[in-house]
Amino acid sequence: MKKINKRMKKIKNDINFEKLYYIDELIQLLKKSSNVNFNESIDVAINLGINPKKSDQNIRGSTILPHGTGRCVKVAVFTQGENIKIAKKAGAEFIGMEDLAEQIKKEGIKFHTAIASPDAMKIVTQLGQILGPRGLMPNPKLGTVTTNIEEAIKNAKTGQVCYRNDKNGIIHATIGRINFERNQIKENFNVFLESIKKAKPPQSKGIYIKKVVLSSTMGIGLTLDQSSLSI
């Protein structure tokens, strides 16, 4: 632990946290400063020029990262009939209707994404107090309430990231892992940021993207110089 702290202290001493970093240098510093024995996530926090107290300025959406997030995504699917076979073939870990709802209530099964066919929403809405706070409530805008169960599962498994601003107008998301190639992290970030830009509400005035910070799970957080972006 002392060796780790000593190395981290040196890294922090060598980094100017007041500086705005170009995207390539920023990613390089995050990778260089990683000093834990697990594959850290690369996270982004985007401070938006919105009023989160006004419902017409809140942002919610999703996008598919070209290189995925680097984690094994467990999917729960609320559906019935022929869709059960489709969901199994597509790789969903948990599938069902009332029985799946009971599993969630009583066993507290863990998953990263919940998908539902429209005819299952009566059951899903009963789980609002459980799924809502965890950001797992299926939503048509996110493509997680759909008749195309196969596509929704594929998207979730291959890098779909759902996002929404918090009460402070900040969006948080994971866009990769520390062992990704620099260009992979950069391409994931560019796709994510482009999605946020497209989601700008008309009611938002002034500077929309105020600040962008990239960080690793246990490492440093650095502020991006937005002039270095090509999008």
Curated annotation (Swiss-Prot):
Any one of the GO CC terms: cytosolic large ribosomal subunit
Entries under Pfam families matching the protein: Ribosomal_L1
Molecular function in Gene Ontology: rRNA binding; structural constituent of ribosome; tRNA binding
CDD domains attached to this UniProt entry: Ribosomal_L1
InterPro entries documented for this protein: Ribosom_uL1_bac-type, Ribosomal_uL1, Ribosomal_uL1-like, Ribosomal_uL1/biogenesis, Ribosomal_uL1_3-a/b-sand, Ribosomal_uL1_CS
One BP term from GO: translation
Keywords: Repressor, Ribonucleoprotein, Ribosomal protein, RNA-binding, rRNA-binding, Translation regulation, tRNA-binding
Top-level taxon of the source organism: Bacteria
Gene3D superfamilies: 3.30.190.20, 3.40.50.790
Record-stated family: Belongs to the universal ribosomal protein uL1 family.
NCBIfam families reported in the protein's UniProt record: rplA_bact (TIGR01169)
Functional summary from the UniProt entry: Binds directly to 23S rRNA. The L1 stalk is quite mobile in the ribosome, and is involved in E site tRNA release.
Assembly, per entry: Part of the 50S ribosomal subunit.
PANTHER family: 54S RIBOSOMAL PROTEIN L1, MITOCHONDRIAL, LARGE RIBOSOMAL SUBUNIT PROTEIN UL1M
UniProt protein name: Large ribosomal subunit protein uL1
